[in-house]
Each structure stands twice: as structure tokens, then as C-alpha cells.
């Protein structure tokens, strides 16, 4: 599960912890990235990570079949470097959202998608829980930048995908439903 903030990661971790008997939770910050990936490859589990997990993590094959992206990965505008860049673009008469923030978020989202499909034979589901990809005018730019695939907006399609792969995951039972209910209630 990819997050854009540690606060969101921690809230979801604490909500899912009581439900994690079948799939241990591997939380960024409690283990090194390398040890988390090793554990993940050996034992069915769930990785909860932020920035460093959006890129450079390579888990090809059957070990990774689902990536959940909780929120579109826009840089936080109040972070000093981002804030300075936005102000610089504004002074130059350039729209910082369209010409800086949006392109960076699109690249980051593509990187998040890339965690799932590393080789031609890899298959899986990316679940994007941020409705802005559908509800905002810039959502089409995100969609156009994503790899080809089947896009759906209901869990039935996800269940069918895993069923057809011969793996009836508990993906659509308490854990994912809990994430989705947290998302709709708290806006992860």
C-alpha cells in the first residue's frame, strides 16, 4: 500500500493491525526496506510504505499481485523546496500547477504503477483510492499517462481477476473494505 504521508500510513496501520492475522503488516520505519522486501517475498504480507516505496522497489513475479495507491502523489506545496519552486514559477508568469506540480505527480503515479508490472508475464491489480482521478479535470492527464490495462471502479472486477488467476485472495474482505471505508471517511 503506497501512501503520500506517514500520518496516513500510521492511521491505516493502526486500523488494520487487529485484522492482520492472515497477512502480517510490514510498516515502513519499523523495518529496513531490504528486510521488508525479503519478508514480503517469503511470506504473504502487506507492505505499508511512503516515498521510497514509490520507486526503485523490484518484486517481480507472483509475490506482488496488488498495489493500493491511497492518494494521487502531489508534492506537499508547503514543503520549502516545492514552495520556492511554485513561487519562482508564479513570478515568471507560469502556472505552477499545470507546469510543475501536475507533471511531477503524473511521473510519481507511473512509478507507483511500475511497482506491480516489472516483467512481461507479471499480472496484478492497482487500486487507486483517490476519486480526483475521475472527478477533477486533470484526472484525464493521469489516466492517459498510465500503462494500458483494464480500468474498473468496483471490487467485483478485482475479485473476478484474482479468481481467474486461481487465487481467491482475501483482498475484498475486511482489509480492503477497511481501507476503503477509512478513505471515504477520513480522506487518506
Residue ranges and their predicted role:
Residues 1-188:
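ASCE RecA-like P-loop NTPase motor cores
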Amino acid at each position: 500500500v503506497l501512501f503520500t504521508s506517514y500520518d496516513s500510513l500510521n492511521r491505516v496501520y493502526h486500523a488494520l493491525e487487529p485484522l492482520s492475522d492472515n497477512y502480517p503488516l510490514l510498516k515502513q520505519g519499523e523495518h529496513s526496506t531490504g528486510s521488508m522486501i525479503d519478508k514480503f517475498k517469503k511470506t504473504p504480507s502487506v507492505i505499508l510504505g511512503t516515498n521510497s516505496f514509490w520507486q526503485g522497489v523490484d518484486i517481480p513475479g507472483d509475490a506482488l499481485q496488488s498495489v493500493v495507491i491511497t492518494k494521487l502523489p502531489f508534492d506537499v506545496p508547503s514543503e520549502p523546496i516545492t514552495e520556492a519552486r511554485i513561487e519562482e514559477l508564479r513570478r515568471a508568469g507560469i502556472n505552477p500547477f499545470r507546469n510543475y506540480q501536475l507533471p511531477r505527480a503524473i511521473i510519481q503515479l507511473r512509478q507507483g504503477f511500475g511497482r506491480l508490472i516489472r516483467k512481461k508475464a507479471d499480472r496484478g491489480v492497482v487500486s487507486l483510492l483517490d476519486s480526483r482521478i475521475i472527478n477533477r479535470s486533470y484526472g484525464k492527464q493521469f489516466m492517459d499517462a498510465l500503462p494500458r490495462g483494464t480500468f474498473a471502479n468496483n471490487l467485483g472486477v478485482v475479485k473476478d481477476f484474482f479468481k481467474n488467476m486461481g487465487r481467491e485472495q482475501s483482498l475484498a474482505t475486511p482489509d480492503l473494505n477497511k481501507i476503503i471505508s477509512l478513505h471515504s471517511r477520513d480522506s487518506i
